[in-house]
């Protein structure tokens, strides 16, 4: 049967399906017997039979139906001719006696025959067309080119997942050189395209570099402000003073890239879906509405703001607004007033411009990196001053949990593990635990639960609670290992605690990717007492590796970790423990529940491990949810003032 892919949906629906010869003969016999019976009763004159139609006749709209009825015939219509006999099937058969059949029974026979014919023809087959889009990600970082946190992981993986689902995807980010040629950008070539951006009192030229990798167009905006020592956003003295200028250039360049860059021989054009990430890219929806749509450009484009961390909003003094190159009447979209307690002195009016607020106002849809976080940002506690504005846009606010890269985080293939294992064979995990204990200088004890922590050593991650709980935990028969850096005070505490509990505690100051993989695989329990966590990745890695998470029930942690329920049927419910509120008592209670289950209920513990390992946190799953957001965005009209 011809399909919609080759003929178009309408044409495909009008093609008669082919019937196999054997079944056609059986249908012909049934039809021949029915015709013979009706001819005997004289029914053919009133209702001639014909084969059941293969396709329903279309119903005309009411305005196409004739309003006048045709005149009645003056003479009786001539009797309908007797249908010619159908050709014999060539197969011998005994004709049944049809004397006792009524017309109603004949009708039923015809209905059954028609129903069989419909089944044979497979009329249920329908043409399905998937909408593919031109998607433009705008971000301050993307792995493996430049990364400082979870934002880089998302923007390095989600575009690839969308490209694998058939979309044309571009990622626009700065070309960070750190004062010298960065090997991460070695495969990007100069496109010979450059533009001059009118902002900050002049015209600033930027150029474009391009690399095609993993079915994605990676576009790098080049400017001298991206060529300096330090990290992406600052150095040892703090954030760079010209970050507003640096990311204004990025946003302007991202708006121009789909119009001027012929990637693969074709530009992306105007019907794009812009996915802007955090404050660094938040000027893009404002530019689309203020500087492009009024002139007929990007009227068919839409934008989605993805909030990874609401704490960073790109706030600068109000006096910088004219530098952005926006019309004066658009000041209100970015206007921000600090509360009195946050002002520097009594004469400070607290007036500022807020990049992220501009995107919250003008973006067509808003996404947070978990469902729980989408609710938290509308509360006074979690909204960082934008809670009322975000609450007013609840109708376009959704949460989607980030995915993980199962090519990098897979216990059956992980290059950093001494032994591999899977949900069907967990024996390698016990060996990884023993190797980790030996590597860290801890006694090799398979019966002792090994608890781990991986993350920044700061207040947001709940390190202060861990510090308070360690003396109590060390009285129990457990081992505890921590990996991270941050607050110098917490770093010093880790070193001193290791000296006090040589056989039970290890603290690794700093960060090492191989060690983080081995801790994730070797530990039995992962502790995450974060005060807030928009999504969180470590709990996803832990479940992928059969390590049971104990987390504070906030943001993405609450969304992804299902509480263990020992009273469910066969105890088969839950992937960990999520405690709330965030107190030392609640945290210790959850940890002791996990420790008790590990020691005394081995089958329940194995179920926890396997359910976590079977959870679907792939980027493909997240990408399918983003596709739905794109559909919703294109259903509505774009933002205009």
Swiss-Prot record:
Keyword terms of this UniProt record: Amyloplast, Chloroplast, Glycosyltransferase, Plastid, Starch biosynthesis, Transferase, Transit peptide
Principal place of residence: plastid
Transit peptide (residue range): 1-113
Binding site for ADP-alpha-D-glucose: 147
Annotated disulfide bonds: none
Enzyme Commission code(s) on record: 2.4.1.21
Pfam families (UniProt xref): Glyco_transf_5 (PF08323), Glycos_transf_1 (PF00534)
Name of the protein this chain belongs to: Soluble starch synthase 1, chloroplastic/amyloplastic
Localization: Plastid, Chloroplast; Plastid, Amyloplast
Substrates-to-products reaction catalysed: [(1->4)-alpha-D-glucosyl](n) + ADP-alpha-D-glucose = [(1->4)-alpha-D-glucosyl](n+1) + ADP + H(+)
Region (Disordered): 62-96
Entries under PANTHER family matching the protein: ALPHA AMYLASE DOMAIN-CONTAINING PROTEIN, GRANULE-BOUND STARCH SYNTHASE 1, CHLOROPLASTIC/AMYLOPLASTIC
Highest taxon of the lineage: Eukaryota
Entry GO MF terms: alpha-1,4-glucan glucosyltransferase (ADP-glucose donor) activity; alpha-1,4-glucan glucosyltransferase (UDP-glucose donor) activity
Pathway membership, UniProt: Glycan biosynthesis; starch biosynthesis
Biased amino acid composition, Pro residues: 68-87
Any one GO biological process: starch biosynthetic process
Additional facts recorded: Three forms of soluble starch synthase were purified: RSS1, RSS2 and RSS3.
InterPro entries given in the database record: Glyco_trans_1, GS/SS, Starch_synth_cat_dom
Similarity comment: Belongs to the glycosyltransferase 1 family. Bacterial/plant glycogen synthase subfamily.
GO terms for cellular component: amyloplast; chloroplast
């Amino acid at each position: 049967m011809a399909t919609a892919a080759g003929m178009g949906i309408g044409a495909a629906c009008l093609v008669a399906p082919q019937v196999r010869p054997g079944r056609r003969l059986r249908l012909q016999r049934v039809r021949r017997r029915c015709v013979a019976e009706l001819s005997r009763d004289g029914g053919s004159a009133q209702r001639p039979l014909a084969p059941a139609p293969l396709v329903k006749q279309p119903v005309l709209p009411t305005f196409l139906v004739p309003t006048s009825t045709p005149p009645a015939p003056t003479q009786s219509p001539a009797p309908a001719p007797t249908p010619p006999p159908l050709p014999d099937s060539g197969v011998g058969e005994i004709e049944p006696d049809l004397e006792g059949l009524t017309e109603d029974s004949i009708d039923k026979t015809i209905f059954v025959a028609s129903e069989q014919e419909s089944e044979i023809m497979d009329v249920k087959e329908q043409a399905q067309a998937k909408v593919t889009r031109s998607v433009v990600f705008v971000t301050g970082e993307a792995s493996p080119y430049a990364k400082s946190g979870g934002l880089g992981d998302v923007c390095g993986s989600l575009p690839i997942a969308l490209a694998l689902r058939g979309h044309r995807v571009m990622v626009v980010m700065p070309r960070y050189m750190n004062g010298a040629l960065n090997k991460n950008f070695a495969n990007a070539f100069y496109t010979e395209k450059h533009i001059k951006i009118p902002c900050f009192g002049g015209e600033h030229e930027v150029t474009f570099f391009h690399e095609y990798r993993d079915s994605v167009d990676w576009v790098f905006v080049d400017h001298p402000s991206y060529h300096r020592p330090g990290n992406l956003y600052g150095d040892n003295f703090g954030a760079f003073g010209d970050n507003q200028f640096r990311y204004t250039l990025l946003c302007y360049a991202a708006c121009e890239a789909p119009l001027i860059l012929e990637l693969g021989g074709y530009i992306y054009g105007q019907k794009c879906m812009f996915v802007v990430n955090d404050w660094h890219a938040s000027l893009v929806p404002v530019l689309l509405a203020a500087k492009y749509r009024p002139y007929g450009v990007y009227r068919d484009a839409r934008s989605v703001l993805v909030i990874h961390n609401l704490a960073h909003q790109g706030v600068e003094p109000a006096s910088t607004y004219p530098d952005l190159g926006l019309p004066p009447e658009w000041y209100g979209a970015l206007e921000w007033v600090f509360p009195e307690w946050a002002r520097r002195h009594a004469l400070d009016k607290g007036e500022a411009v807020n990049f992220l607020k501009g995107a919250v106002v003008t973006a067509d849809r808003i996404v947070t990196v978990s469902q729980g976080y989408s609710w938290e940002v509308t509360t006074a506690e979690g909204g960082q001053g934008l809670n009322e504005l975000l609450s007013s846009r609840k109708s376009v606010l959704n949460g989607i949990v980030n995915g993980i890269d199962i090519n990098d985080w897979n216990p059956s293939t992980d290059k950093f593990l001494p032994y591999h294992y899977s949900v069907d064979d967990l024996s390698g995990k016990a060996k990884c635990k023993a190797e980790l204990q030996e590597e860290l200088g801890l006694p090799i004890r398979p019966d002792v639960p090994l608890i781990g922590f991986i993350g920044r050593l700061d207040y947001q991650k709940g390190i202060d609670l861990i510090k308070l709980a360690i003396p109590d935990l060390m009285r129990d028969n457990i081992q505890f290992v921590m990996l991270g850096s941050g607050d110098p005070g917490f770093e010093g505490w880790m070193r001193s605690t290791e000296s006090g509990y040589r056989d039970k505690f290890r603290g690794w100051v700093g960060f090492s990717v191989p060690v983080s993989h081995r801790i994730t695989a070797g530990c039995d329990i992962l502790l995450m007492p974060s005060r807030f966590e928009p999504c969180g990745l470590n709990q996803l890695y832990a479940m992928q590796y059969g390590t049971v998470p104990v987390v504070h029930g906030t943001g993405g942690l609450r969304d992804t970790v299902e509480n263990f329920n020992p009273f469910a049927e066969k105890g088969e419910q839950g992937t960990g423990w999520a405690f709330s509120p965030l107190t030392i008592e609640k945290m210790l209670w959850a940890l002791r529940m996990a420790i008790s289950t590990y020691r005394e209920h081995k089958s329940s513990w194995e179920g926890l491990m396997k359910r976590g390992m079977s959870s679907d946190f792939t980027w493909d799953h997240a990408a399918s949810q983003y596709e739905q957001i794109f559909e919703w965005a294109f259903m509505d009209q774009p933002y205009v003032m």
